[in-house]
């Protein structure tokens, strides 16, 4: 059915989109509770393994709209030849581009070897390669986006016990070797191919007993999303049973070879990662370097790219979504309380299905509802735009609205935008600090903050590789000078300063006069930034490469561009 025909089959009455005809009826319902925010938007699953090939592939303009969180890239001096391709994607060589688009990087250390599964040589060889990688990274004083050393990859599949000995003991040797040179960069692992409680228990127990626990726990989800929630719950219970403090979770490979190019199943993974509190997740690598694993083809978007563009458009807070089951229809949603816009992205089911929104009272009694879809185009087919299914004004009853979408394909992705019929700014003006790319600082909650959260512990270690900064990816309609208002708190009793730079340009200084208390907001300062039309990256830094460092301390609530 064409988009026009499908749209004509939809009638709106009493706040419900009613479908005509006899579409096949899956009749699943995904519930979105807009009044139940559970974490700031941080686009945790917008990332990829071997996502970048060089310093410009894919092009920046294809990456900025996606608000990339974390990438896992091969080791410095990469030797890995996946699928027979020449080595590429060296984490340090692509770091300038990753930085330009706001993305953090993990370094996958065993990818210094050419083969997969890795072919063990000797302990002398491996430890020398570890030293080389760490030394290369430490010498890269202009690189500040490296946020993890991944010590090995899929040891439950690739570790050669006969030649190299027990993996748990090997982990300790490698961990200690890295820490002998780099005491600050987080360590990521064990990065197993699958989640297995018995395997993980053995690893964690040994790591706990040898004081070599990873800072970030990592495993892969490559066998559908049905068990993701159970795996996360099992891991958290395992931590508690072993007396281990909660670690950040990274799923740095997700989706099967078939699913990776299907927006519907991918939406289900993202939903479960968001609800499960995962820190970051990366699309699995199955085919080619430098496409974010099928999101781009010849620097043009595929169908899957649009799913991540919808994800990138989210701001404010993720809100609770409840599927009927762990298989089939699922999705994720966000509410931007400043603009009063709700985004929901979903898929994984065919036929006629429903998305029920509750907690919409803050949007008013009448809203505009837009429904879009994007197909499973495959990784080599360009999709120039999503298909608009409907764009309608709808009444909201008791804060509720149900959108019925007929003729869904289980492989396609779907997007619903709910917003007031008037009063929405023509472009996003306020950008919450907690939604930005945050390096070595932390998110906190506060009832006085703009959207209930802010960024604090913005520090300067004296080393630009490991100091704190916040990168705001903004999108403006025209090239001109914008007034940038910054919401902040500074309870030091004296003026604090940050460095300000945008689009990699020169540094200036922002001064923050003292305020009454930490975590209490309302104070603002303003400055001017000259931005190009489209996407820009604005950095506020306590410390960063090529910046001498800020003074005092300030917490960031938001920036606003007018």
Over which residues does each language-model region extend?
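N-terminal export and membrane-targeting signals
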Residues: 1-7
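Non-catalytic accessory regions flanking glycosidase/transglycosidase catalytic cores in CAZymes
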Residues: 15-148, 172-189, 300-303, 307-462, ...
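Active-site cleft segment of glycoside hydrolase catalytic domains centered on the general acid/base Glu
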Residues: 55, 115-238, 242, 255-269, ...
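Catalytic-core region of carbohydrate-active enzymes that cleave or remodel glycosidic bonds
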Residues: 222-290, 295-315, 350, 362
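Short beta-strand elements bearing conserved aromatic residues within extracellular beta-rich modules
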Residues: 369, 498-500
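A short beta-strand element within beta-rich, extracytoplasmic domains
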Residues: 468-492, 496-498
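Extracellular carbohydrate recognition and processing domains
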Residues: 502-535
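Short beta-strand-plus-loop segments that form exposed binding edges in beta-rich domains
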Residues: 540-549
